[in-house]
Amino acid sequence: MQIPFSVYWIPLDVQFTDKPSLKDPVMIAAWPGMGFLAKISADYLRRRIKAKQFAEIKYFHNVLVYKNGIVEMAPIKHKLYASEDQNLIICVGDAQPSVPEESLRLAQKISDIAVEMGVKRIYTMAAFPNEFYDEPKVYGVFTDESMRDELIETGVEMIENDGAVNGLNGVMIGVAK
């Protein structure tokens, strides 16, 4: 009989395949959520600007997969892409951790990589349930007043009510702040 173990003891595996040449890049991070909107948008952006993968983070989800009756741990991948032309890093994940502690651990690892790459600003993407509008809108929450004012000038609308940012998006904002 095997002794149960905690996935928290398994280190997050980061593999770099390249070190892009960037100067104070911006990072956009996205994970699947409502309607996969953020992941689809980030994947579209990375393809559109021809960003190249330079790293991958793997961690294990609390799900086992099986094939022909044999189970194995299912790694979840978060790929990091860079566009030197746009001075941009895009982090796209296959899934969000289902355990809050794992969200914190993953957000810290992404933040560590961002710091190592010289990133000063991280934007996360997520869908926001709202009424249908003919013209799409972009809503945001901000880590400080100066960022709020700057982004409102670009057309980002502030979410007016109090609320919460759930999942990895909220944790990433908190860790990066």
Q: Where are the model-predicted features located?
A:
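Flexible, glycine/proline-enriched loop segments at strand-loop-helix junctions
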Residues: 31-32, 94-101, 154-163
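Internal, conserved structured core segments that host functional sites
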Residues: 99-148
